[in-house]
Structure formats: structure tokens, C-alpha cells
Amino acid sequence: MLRGSTSVCRSLELVTQAARYASAATAAAPTGKRIKTFEIYRFNPEEPGAKPKLQKFDVDLDKCGTMVLDALIKIKNEVDPTLTFRRSCREGICGSCAMNIAGENTLACICNIDQNTSKTTKIYPLPHMFVIKDLVPDMNLFYAQYASIQPWLQKKTKINLGEKQQYQSIKEQEKLDGLYECILCACCSASCPSYWWNADKYLGPAVLMQAYRWIIDSRDDSAAERLARMQDGFSAFKCHTIMNCTKTCPKHLNPARAIGEIKMLLTKMKTKPAPLPTPANF
């Protein structure tokens, strides 16, 4: 009985899916007064020999939200359900919908649609990354590099978890401002020419900023070891201060400054300050 029910449910699912595709295929072109054209990068690895292309979609701005992600969702729901992209929070927090819109790396969920209907908006996946499908880049290398910096607090003194807090003064905590807010969207790294050509060795702006976040943390005891892993000509020093990373960051952070601080620590121009003593009444 259960097997038969499963088979029926699967059949209904296939029928529903087929109806959805048929409806999308016959969707009428929008006829409103404010029709915006989007050219979207398309690539399907399941089509042998198929080459990437730009496909045009028209959207009625009077029946769509104000953000580019709203337009993408509308296109997927009403025109072409095969259009593939990442998205989650829809409010600039998760970093999932990072892509190249009108020539700039940004988040689709916080990028306003250009209201000039005479101009076509072109949308590509993040540049210089392998493309899985359409607007979905392969982030495996990026996340592997992030894991390589060991992005967690490391203590050399024995502590009993839950026994007490790790003290950090207000001034010490302020050094982390503008660092921990990074959402790992990779907009900055994908905008960096040095990362384009040396991604296998150069860690890139996003990962280096996260590395500095742990290096400078007064509670962390492994700054020397963290810096030692970057004592080569590529990990950090391939940054040529082009500043694309800072310009494109959707969170308005400054990866270039963090990389500069790492370089000064590596060359002994600076040293990490000793942590302030824990107050007696803490």
C-alpha cells in the first residue's frame, strides 16, 4: 500500500512539474508601460557541447519588486523555471546571491533594479570562477582557503568551557569592527585580478580579512602560527593594492586595509599588542 501511494505521489509530482514547464513556455510577454530587459548568463552542463550564452528576459517593473533578486525570482517562477541561482536571506546577510550585475560584483537582494527601461541590465555569475550552472559559481576553492586559516579562537592556556568568559576590553573589541561583519559572499575576491591569476596560491581579500580578524583578536593565542603560514610570496604579498575589493564590498568593509595590516605584521613593521589584563572583578 505504501509503495503504491509513493508511486502515485511521484506521478502527481511529475504531472505538476510538466504543467509548470508548459505554463512557463507559453507565458505571454509582459505588456506594461515599464518593461525592463535583463540579459542573463546561461550555461547548462547537462547539454553536451552547449556553449554559454546570454538570454533576454522582459520584466514588467510595475509588477515586480525593486531588487534584482526580485526580478530573477519572478523570471524563474513565471517564465523559465530552469533559471538557476543561489539565494536565501533576501536582506544582504547570507551572501548567497552574489553575482556580477551591470559590471559590478554585488548581492542581487540589495541591488536596486536600474529603472531606466531603455538600458538592458546584464547579469553574470561571479567572474573567474568555474560555473556549475547559470549564475551558480563553484565556491569549493574559496571555502577550502577559508578553512585553511583555521577561523576559530585558539587558546594555549587551559580553560574549562562554560566556567568563565574570555575577557576583552572595549578598545580591544573595537579592533574587530569592520572585520567580523564579512559574510563570505566572495564579491571582493572575485573582483581581484591577483586572485584571478593566482587563486591556487593567493588567499584573496575575503580570506585574508578573516585571517586578520583572528590574528588581531586579543583573546587568540596563535597569531604567530597564523602569520607563519603566510610567510611566502603568494599568500598575502600577491595583493597589489588595486583596491577593487574595497570598492565592490556590499557590506562596505575594507579588505585592503586588513591585508596591509597583515603585511606590516609579516615584515615586523608592527607587532600584535599584548592583551590587557583581566580586571579583578571580572
From Swiss-Prot:
Identify the main location: mitochondrion
Q: Which residues form the 4Fe-4S ferredoxin-type domain?
A: 172-202
The alphabetized list of GO BP terms reads: mitochondrial electron transport, succinate to ubiquinone; tricarboxylic acid cycle
| UniProt binding sites for a rhodoquinol | 197
Q: Which cofactor does it need?
A: [2Fe-2S] cluster; [3Fe-4S] cluster; [4Fe-4S] cluster
Function in brief? Iron-sulfur protein (Ip) subunit of the mitochondrial electron transport chain complex II which, together with the flavoprotein (Fp) subunit forms the catalytic core of the complex. During the free-living egg-larvae stages, which occur in an aerobic environment, complex II acts as a succinate dehydrogenase by transferring electrons from succinate to ubiquinone. During the parasitic larvae and adult stages, which occur in an anaerobic environment, complex II acts as a fumarate reductase by transferring electrons from rhodoquinol to fumarate.
The protein's name is: Succinate dehydrogenase [ubiquinone] iron-sulfur subunit, mitochondrial
Species for this entry = Ascaris suum (Pig roundworm)
